[in-house]
Every structure is written in C-alpha cells, then in structure tokens.
Design a protein with these regions (language model features):
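Conserved Rossmann-fold cofactor-binding substructure of NAD(P)-dependent oxidoreductases
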Residues: 2-27
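Short, conserved active-site loop motifs that form the nucleotide-linked donor/cofactor pocket
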Residues: 1-3, 121, 171
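A conserved pocket-lining segment of Rossmann-fold NAD(P)-dependent short-chain dehydrogenase/reductase
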Residues: 40, 127-174
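Catalytic helix-loop patch of NAD(P)-dependent Rossmann-fold dehydrogenases
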Residues: 42-57, 64, 68-69, 78-147
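Alpha-helical elements of Rossmann-like donor-binding domains used by nucleotide-donor carbohydrate transfer enzymes
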Residues: 14-17, 27, 57, 108-109, ...
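Residue-level signal for alpha-helix termini/capping positions
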Residues: 20-23, 63-64, 115, 157
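N-terminal Rossmann-like NAD(P) cofactor-binding module of classical short-chain dehydrogenase/reductase
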Residues: 26-29, 71
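Conserved NAD(P)H cofactor-binding loop of Rossmann-fold oxidoreductase domains
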Residues: 31-35, 74-75
C-alpha cells in the first residue's frame, strides 16, 4: 500500500486532483461507502447517491488517468436471502435492501466499465468477515477496534504490524 488518500468521492475535482498529484497510481482499492443496512432502508437516496455516484466519479477519473485496476469492497448483502448454503460466488444476487442494491448496481457498472474501458475489477463480498453480531449488539464503532479488516487497514496506513486485540474471540471464516 503506497498511499492512503482520504477524500470525498462525491467531489470529482478532489479525485482528479488526487490522481493528478499521484501519477504513479496504477490501481485503486475502493472501500468508501455507507454500509448500515437499517439506515439504507430509512434513507435509500443517501446510499444510492453516495455508493453509486461516488463510485461513478471514481471510475470516470480512473478512465481519464488510464488506471485500469480496482479492488471493490462489495457485500454479501448483494445475495439477499440465501437459496442454499454455503453461499458461493455463483449464488443468485437478489438484494433485499438499498445498501445491497447499491453495491450490486456498482458491480454491474464495473462490468460495463470493463467492456467499455478495460477497467478490471475484483469484488470482495464480505459476510461480516470480522465477527459482526447478527443481533446488532456489536456496532461499527469500537474503541478499541475489534474487527480484523479495520485493524489491517490501520496497520497499513501506519506501516506497523497488524494485531488482533480480540485473540480470545473467534473470527468467522470465509
């Protein structure tokens, strides 16, 4: 990880400026999105605008700067209700909430950008990969952070070794 860039994907000028200032960027890891299912049901426009429009802005800037690789943080919410278990990549995608639909829409957009511009994508469809509680007793704000993926990203940004502060708790395998 060469650079962690904080910004707002809803501002295309910020993306353009960032890519202009960093011409050696050859790939993007895209984790920026709203991700609360319950909130997405109450305020779907917020999720569609942020998750879809923000990604379109990013893809357009990537196209303009010749960046043709992206890792996209999608979600298992694109699958909807399981038709079989365990769920695999070939499982039908039928989201049941705006959050899942916003992520699936972005996946379809990425298919179109691949066909039109050659932007290759890898999509990560997480299943509460770091131990989130299905009863929502564990939220997204932890002090100290207890989820694996945020700890790995923090370590990458700080260029330190990632640690697991909850060694006694099991992580869900995926």
């Amino acid at each position: 990880l060469k650079a962690f860039i904080k910004g707002n994907l809803l501002n295309p000028q910020d993306i353009e400026q960032t890519l202009k200032e960093n011409p050696d960027i050859t790939a993007v890891i895209h984790f920026a999105a709203y991700s609360q299912v319950a909130e997405s049901v109450k305020n779907p426009g917020k999720y569609y605008r942020n998750n879809i429009v923000g990604t379109l802005n990013l893809l357009d800037a990537m196209t303009h700067h010749g960046i043709c690789q992206i890792v996209f943080s999608s979600t298992a919410a694109t699958y909807g209700e399981p038709q079989y278990s365990p769920i695999d990549e070939k499982h039908p995608q039928n989201p049941v909430n705006p959050y899942g639909m916003s992520k699936l829409t972005v996946e379809h957009i990425m298919d179109d950008y691949d066909k039109a511009y050659g932007i290759k994508s890898v999509r990560l469809r997480y299943f509460n990969a770091a131990g989130a509680d299905t009863n929502t007793r564990i939220g997204e704000w932890h002090q100290p952070e207890t989820h694996l993926i945020p700890n790995i990203l923090k370590a990458a940004v700080q260029q330190t070794q990632a640690t697991n502060p909850t060694e006694k708790k099991a992580f869900q395998l995926y």
